[in-house]
């Protein structure tokens, strides 16, 4: 079953194929073919790559580990209020919009949080920034704008 939330992945999927988000949300899940072993491996490799890049670039970071949206959002908001430098696997929420950027990076500047604000960063296995990546990051930026008042 598809999430009841509008997510950054929905925007990514839309740019891949405009019909994809519709079928994800309203299509019969029994008609969906299971992932192949190669597809499962590619997903696992992508996560391993992401974790390696985040560790290499940022070293230490605070991680939001829970998958529950409300718990993950509460943890993320608490870390943002504390002003931690890097949040890995953050969860942003506003109404029925939910985003899970790979990283939130703290920057100096005024926001509702204090003398800092956060920007979204996503790790991709690509040599160039694609429009679907920009759509995801823009979605996360809109959520951050709502949360940070800027």
Regions found by a protein language model. Give the residues of each.
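Metal-dependent nuclease catalytic cores that hydrolyze phosphodiester bonds in DNA/RNA
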Residues: 1-113
């Amino acid at each position: 079953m598809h999430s009841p939330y509008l997510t950054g992945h929905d925007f990514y999927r839309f740019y891949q194929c405009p019909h994809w988000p519709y079928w994800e949300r309203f299509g019969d899940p029994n008609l969906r073919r299971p992932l192949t072993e190669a597809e499962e491996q590619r997903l696992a490799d992508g996560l391993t790559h992401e974790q390696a890049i985040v560790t290499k670039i940022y070293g230490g970071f605070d991680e939001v580990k829970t998958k529950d949206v409300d718990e993950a959002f509460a943890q993320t908001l608490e870390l943002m209020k504390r002003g931690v430098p890097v949040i890995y696997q953050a969860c942003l929420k506003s109404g029925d919009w939910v985003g899970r950027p790979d990283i939130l990076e703290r920057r100096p500047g005024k926001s509702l949080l204090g003398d800092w604000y956060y920007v979204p960063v996503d790790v991709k296995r690509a040599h160039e920034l694609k429009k679907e990546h920009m759509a995801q990051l823009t979605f996360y930026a809109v959520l951050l704008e709502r949360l940070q008042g800027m």
